[in-house]
């Protein structure tokens, strides 16, 4: 868990500002809701919090440290973003998809370590997917597919 804070955060695409001058403090362990109409910038804002998009202006802090100065591995251990629409047309097994959550921790040739495999197995168990781990995502129900994407975020 971590404290997450923004100060005058402005985020967008190219020169188009989508979210402007947002200051928010999310204390450790606090659950918040982000609501608004379609196209209002909710996903864009979350992408900035997860360091997927860089701020146009302002700052994002994780535990009082500027997010841009923190190593990717450390950010990934504290923040994961699960998209509202995840592509399940890929021909991968559940275990393979969950293993992508370990990407920020891989070095060199990108081989998984014993610690990675442990995190993957834990995430599969936590989402009740262990018995389905070697099945193709195509064979799952909608709810099971959602659990796969949640497991990937947990493995991260």
Q: Where in the sequence are the language-model features?
A:
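Helix-to-loop junction immediately C-terminal to a conserved catalytic motif
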Residues: 50
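Conserved ABC transporter NBD signature motif
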Residues: 58-66, 75
């Amino acid at each position: 868990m971590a404290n997450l804070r923004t100060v005058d955060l402005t985020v967008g695409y190219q020169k188009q500002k989508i979210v402007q001058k947002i200051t928010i403090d999310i204390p450790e362990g606090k659950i918040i809701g982000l609501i608004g109409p379609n196209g209002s910038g909710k996903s864009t804002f979350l992408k900035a919090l997860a360091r997927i998009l860089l701020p146009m202006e302002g700052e994002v802090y994780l535990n009082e440290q500027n997010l841009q100065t923190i190593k990717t591995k450390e950010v990934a251990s504290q923040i994961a973003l699960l998209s509202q629409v995840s592509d399940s047309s890929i021909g991968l097994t559940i275990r393979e998809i969950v293993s992508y959550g370990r990407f920020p921790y891989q070095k060199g040739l990108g081989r998984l370590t014993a610690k990675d495999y442990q995190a993957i197995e834990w995430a599969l168990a936590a989402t009740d997917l262990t018995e389905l781990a070697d099945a193709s995502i195509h064979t799952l129900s909608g709810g099971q597919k959602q659990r796969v994407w949640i497991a990937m975020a947990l493995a991260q």
